[in-house]
């Protein structure tokens, strides 16, 4: 599965390199959502809430009101906030360091995604700004019991469009008893296809926003034509009527 990402800061969709260097900002957030939702779930991340510099909560509520399947992340640090987003229509909530808190067990496990944000092998916190001193590998087992999936982000690769650190990705996917979504450095359809073969999903941002990766190509890359005995799933549409 591909999961396009809308990272929000000051009411705009933004992309940062390595979580700190702004690259672009766009105001057409709702148009992006309408496009991205065609491929399945969309990740909407409140960067301001994650870094403690503000909030895009009102905008996220409006996005959820469209009925699009959205996983919400950024700044969710207590049970009330997590429940509020789920009640507002979020398909899932993405939790960072808060995933270690006891209240997390009161949430529906299948609607919780735990963010494993890593610089190298170290888990980072506070919107990727600080190191925790903990190794990602040591967290997978204990945190897997609290969630339905992990979001593994390679912070050093985020926004760089220089490829994925495959040995680390493969190690995390292999060690995890729950599904893993990978983010950071995913640039080509081949990257998406390789993740699919590993059994992982691809959360994509910078490559899509800059036009380096076409979402249709990324979607098709997940299809294993060999398994279908030459059959290809299709959706047909009348060019004249649009039906």
Sequence positions of predicted segments:
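Flexible "arm" and connector segments at domain edges
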Residues: 129, 136-137, 207, 212-243
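Glycine-rich, proline-tolerant flexible connector loops at the mouths of alpha/beta enzymes
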Residues: 41-55, 59, 152-161
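Hydrophobic faces of well-ordered beta-strands that scaffold small-molecule active sites
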Residues: 2-8, 42-44, 70-74, 93-95, ...
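Conserved anion-binding
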Residues: 6-22, 83, 90-158
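Catalytic cores of alpha/beta
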Residues: 58-60, 65-95, 102-104, 167-202
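Short catalytic helix/loop segments, enriched in acidic residues and glycine
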Residues: 18-36
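Charged helix-capping and loop-helix junction motifs
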Residues: 25, 54-61, 129-138, 162-171
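C-terminal helical cap(s) of enzyme catalytic domains, especially alpha/beta-barrels
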Residues: 102-114, 192-221
